[in-house]
Regions:
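P-loop/Walker-type NTP enzyme "switch/lid" segment
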Residues: 32-113
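Walker A/P-loop phosphate-binding motif and the immediately C-terminal alpha-helix
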Residues: 2-44, 114
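Short coil/turn connectors at secondary-structure junctions
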Residues: 1, 27-28, 83, 117, ...
């Protein structure tokens, strides 16, 4: 199976909502790793609406010191009910970021072992280049996706990172982009030409539906019908179709990258 990492050059283009959306549409067991070191867990605060007291990434530092990192990981992940998704939640405060730097390299080895054993791993790496950034995960995933919007500011911020990620790519490691809101105003072809990277897929621009994944918001209501109608409309939405298509494209690209290593 595959280790797939999503990261942003700047701002908040929608990495977390996209990772969660892809995971919740994944056709087989998948582990989500919240590796964004910049603040408290966005997943616990957002998707799980302020859930507190759950173990997570920071608890693995002590396990690593004791030489039991691989054994400790299953004990600190949380399972999402009625899904095949489990989540390793991130840091609790920004002050923990420097301490995370020591865990990324050994955690990479554990995650690769998990992927080799048949479980996919999706990493939310947050913004590139910040203190405590999970550089080893970004550099050595089967597939790294640079997530950005399609406006000029996003392209300008992503340009140097696209060049750096391409230059650092090793055999078996693929780097592509994932565009949130293609055509606002630039096309996938424009993005690819500017950054010198292929565009894996585009995720629809739909902040209201993205909030369902990022913030645990209720699904948009329909004019007729109650929650069941809202569920059906959400499942049939162009946004969710784009999330599913992005996940399928990511699985194929990661598989191809692994075959080429």
């Amino acid at each position: 199976m595959a280790l797939i990492c999503l990261a942003a050059a700047a701002g908040s283009p929608g990495v977390t909502s996209t990772v969660l959306g892809m995971a919740l549409c994944w056709p087989r067991p998948v582990l989500v790793v919240e590796a964004d070191p910049t603040a408290g867990s966005a997943i616990l605060a957002g998707r799980f609406r302020g859930l507190q007291g759950h173990a997570g990434l920071i608890d693995l530092i002590a396990a690593h010191r004791s030489g039991v990192l691989a054994e400790a990981l299953p004990r600190v992940v949380m399972s999402v009910p009625d899904t095949q998704v489990s989540i390793l939640t991130g840091s609790r405060t920004h002050a923990q970021a420097p301490g995370l730097a020591r865990i990324w390299e050994p955690l990479l080895g554990v995650l690769k072992s998990i992927a080799s054993a048949g479980q996919d791993v999706l990493v939310d790496a947050g913004q590139l280049g910040v203190d405590g950034s999970p550089t080893p995960l970004v550099a050595e995933a089967d597939l790294t996706l640079l997530v950005l919007r399609s406006n000029l500011r996003a392209l300008a911020s992503a340009k140097s990172w696209a060049e750096a990620l391409s230059a650092d790519a090793v055999p078996g490691h693929e780097v592509q982009t994932l565009v949130i809101g293609e055509g606002r105003p630039y096309s996938a072809a424009d993005v690819s030409r500017t950054l010198g990277l292929p565009v894996l897929a585009g995720v629809g621009w739909d902040p209201r539906r993205a909030e369902v994944f990022a913030d645990g918001a209720d699904k948009p209501t329909t004019r007729w019908g109650g929650p069941t109608a809202a569920d059906r409309a959400f499942e049939a939405s162009g946004y969710l179709r784009s999330i599913r298509a992005a996940g399928e494209a990511a699985r194929k690209a990661a598989s191809s990258a692994g075959e080429g290593s």
